[in-house]
Amino acid sequence: MHLPDGLIPLWQAAIYWILTMIILALYLYKLSKTEDKQKVLINTAILAAVTFAASSISIPSPFGVPIHLFIIPLVVILLGPLSGVAVAFLCFIAQFLFLGMGGITSLGANVVTMGIVMSFSTYYFYRFTAELDDRLSIFSGTFMGIIMATIAQVVILLIAGVATLEVLLSTLVPFYLFVGVVEGIINIFIISFLFKLKPEMVEIAKVGL
């Protein structure tokens, strides 16, 4: 889902960068008001490292294209949506520098899709279903976060004029539907394990709006 440099017109890329900076500034402000700020920062650093490491792991898929887990929905469920945006921003810089994924001019657009849209979609779908069932809320938050990010990327690419709606829907949507299911199931196991092993990590203060 990482968009490379040169795909999006610079004036559009600048808008996505500005939006990213606004949300990151909001994150820093909210973080300064959060209880257990030190614990939040430590856990954010740990999950940022995990997210970066996970991006280098390829999982075979029936589509012939390997899956790279996002991990951002996991970060959001544990630390809140603004933390998800911050982790996405840090990881995308590291992924570009060390793995050649994404780009610099396209970084803002990537953060908008996989950081902002994915984080807030995950958070609110997770919260909306939390009263029904814990596993359902984890799965639905993860799955819908990935699907909404996919839709956001389709919109960004349509605005950039690089592909038709038919092509984007036929290539991106089926693949990320599959990714959403896989990562949703994985997150159920991870969070259930963390709740038993380190419940304080699951119950830590969230950085959100």
Language model: regions and residue ranges:
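Hydrophobic transmembrane alpha-helices
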Residues: 2-74
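Hydrophobic cores of alpha-helical transmembrane segments in multi-pass inner/ER membrane proteins
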Residues: 16-23, 115-125, 181-193
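C-terminal transmembrane helix-loop-helix hairpin of multi-pass membrane proteins
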Residues: 136-146, 165-209
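Juxtamembrane/transmembrane-helix interface segments of polytopic membrane transporters
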Residues: 149, 153-161, 191, 195
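Interfacial aromatic-anchored transmembrane helix boundaries in multi-pass membrane proteins
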Residues: 56-65, 90-120
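Short helix-perturbing small/polar motifs within transmembrane alpha-helices
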Residues: 112-153
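Hydrophobic alpha-helical transmembrane segments
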Residues: 41-46, 85-89, 112, 135-143, ...
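Membrane-helix interface "capping/anchor" motifs
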Residues: 33-36, 76-87, 129-136
